[in-house]
């Protein structure tokens, strides 16, 4: 038996890709191209560039465009490349969206405006204006724990009426609200919290925008594929296998440990930019244990000692 799901407009397994930096904090475009290639070769059919895990608050508009172009050049013919363009300023978000479209992005990730905590009418206007500004499909990003404002279910239903608002990255953790919206719209839901991927699939989601997928993309894809073909027991077994990294990557800010995991795997990532700080030796040691518990074996020699 197969499980029937709505279409997945951006793919099934997307990684919220880190932005690689050199040891002195400069943008590492060669590293970004290598990392994007690795991700697509290892189970990802989509990438999100300049999202939260991409440290978008600390990259300039020009850096975002250069990064996007480098990733598109590397894998744009093999994977969906989604540009994170969300800010807390509608005009700035529109500018970033238009630059991303011109650069060749396949879609846009637009986070709820943060800090200013707009009312639902403000969210409606913001997302509609951004969606009107380009011809690209839009994935809304609902993460009230970071932004301070949730997209209420009724607002989500109204936003779904826009022809270019086609998906949601759901990091709200409210399964009742997600179920309510899924029952009333054609929006494609993507889990924005790795540990909730399988539960969200069970209520109609189509995939994940993940962080552990930097090194566990193949296994995450296998979990989703098992569920889609009706092998719920197989999907559950993979979910349980991956739980150590689904939770372990988030003992501190996800990008900090994502970059530590990339170092452990010998992959490009480099340091984080301030005000974030790199993982401590203790955090890296625990992360290595988590990765090993989830089945990862390809640790780079001496990776714990390397920085950048």
Curated annotation (Swiss-Prot):
GO BP term, pick one: lysine biosynthetic process via diaminopimelate
Primary residence: cytoplasm
Ligand binding (pyruvate): 53, 209
MF terms in GO: 4-hydroxy-tetrahydrodipicolinate synthase activity
Family, as annotated: Belongs to the DapA family.
Function noted in UniProt: Catalyzes the condensation of (S)-aspartate-beta-semialdehyde [(S)-ASA] and pyruvate to 4-hydroxy-tetrahydrodipicolinate (HTPA).
Protein name: 4-hydroxy-tetrahydrodipicolinate synthase
Organism: Acidothermus cellulolyticus (strain ATCC 43068 / DSM 8971 / 11B)
Gene (UniProt): dapA
């Amino acid at each position: 038996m197969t499980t029937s799901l709505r279409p997945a407009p951006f793919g099934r397994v997307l990684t919220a890709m880190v932005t690689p930096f050199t040891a002195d904090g400069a943008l590492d475009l060669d590293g970004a191209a290598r990392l994007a290639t690795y991700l697509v070769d290892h189970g990802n059919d989509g990438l999100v560039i300049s999202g939260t895990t991409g440290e978008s608050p600390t990259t300039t508009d020009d850096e975002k465009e250069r990064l996007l172009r480098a990733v598109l050049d590397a894998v744009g013919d093999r994977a969906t490349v989604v540009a994170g363009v969300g800010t807390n300023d509608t005009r700035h978000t529109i500018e970033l969206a238009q630059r991303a479209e011109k650069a060749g992005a396949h879609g846009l990730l637009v986070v709820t405006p943060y800090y200013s905590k707009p009312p639902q009418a403000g969210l409606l206007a913001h997302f509609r204006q951004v969606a009107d500004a380009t011809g690209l499909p839009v994935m809304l990003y609902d993460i009230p724990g970071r932004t301070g404002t949730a997209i209420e279910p009724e607002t989500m239903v109204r936003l779904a009426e826009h022809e270019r608002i086609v998906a949601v990255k759901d990091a709200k953790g409210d399964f009742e609200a997600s179920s309510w919206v899924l029952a009333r719209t054609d929006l494609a839901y993507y889990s924005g919290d790795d540990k909730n991927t399988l539960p969200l699939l069970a209520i109609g989601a189509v995939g994940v925008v993940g962080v552990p997928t930097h090194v566990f993309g193949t296994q995450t894809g296998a979990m989703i594929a098992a569920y889609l073909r009706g092998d719920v027991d197989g999907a559950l077994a993979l979910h349980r296998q991956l739980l150590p990294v689904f939770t372990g990557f988030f003992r501190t800010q996800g990008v900090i440990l994502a970059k530590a995991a990339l170092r452990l795997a010998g992959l490009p990532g480099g340091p984080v930019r301030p005000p974030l700080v790199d993982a401590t030796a203790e955090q890296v040691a625990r992360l290595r244990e988590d990765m090993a518990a989830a089945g990862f074996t390809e640790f780079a020699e001496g990776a714990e000692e390397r920085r950048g």
